[in-house]
Regions:
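Generic secondary-structure boundary/loop-capping signal
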Residues: 2-3, 7, 37, 50-54, ...
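Active-site gating loops and adjacent loop-to-helix segments of metal-dependent hydrolytic enzymes
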Residues: 42-58, 99-108
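Metallo-beta-lactamase
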Residues: 1-14, 63-70, 76-79
Length: 119
């Protein structure tokens, strides 16, 4: 995925379709990568398994579908972390491909931090 580098480690990536100018942000630090994709997926239970499904709020449904397919494919291949709206708690995880054009969401493991005692 290509885009404009905003500052070192943060790149704006075109994610057109949902709205004009919809943008994802690729963040990289110390060899780790995260894509914050905004509203790329609206109904995770449907659109991971069937990325060709659009919703009423996509201004350009054909472009939204093409963008979703492209980014899902890239994220599954790269195994990078993904964060975005409309994803199950904790809202950050990985995309897994099934090899048949369908995907699944794999959230990261979440555990609360232990309380730090006053010293």
């Amino acid at each position: 995925m290509e885009g404009s580098i905003l500052v070192p480690g943060i790149q704006a990536v075109k994610a057109n379709g949902h709205t004009p100018g919809h943008t994802a942000y690729a963040v990289e630090s110390e060899g780790q990568k995260l894509l914050i994709w905004g509203d790329l997926v609206h109904a995770h239970a449907v659109q991971f398994a069937r990325p060709g499904v659009s919703i009423e709020y996509d201004i350009d449904p054909k472009q939204a579908i093409a963008t979703r397919r492209s980014i899902l494919k890239a994220m599954a291949a790269s195994k990078s972390l993904v964060a975005g709206m409309h994803l199950p708690f904790p809202g950050i995880g990985h995309v897994r491909a099934d090899g048949k054009g369908r995907y699944s969401w794999v959230p990261i493991e979440f555990a609360p931090l232990s309380k730090v005692e006053n010293q």
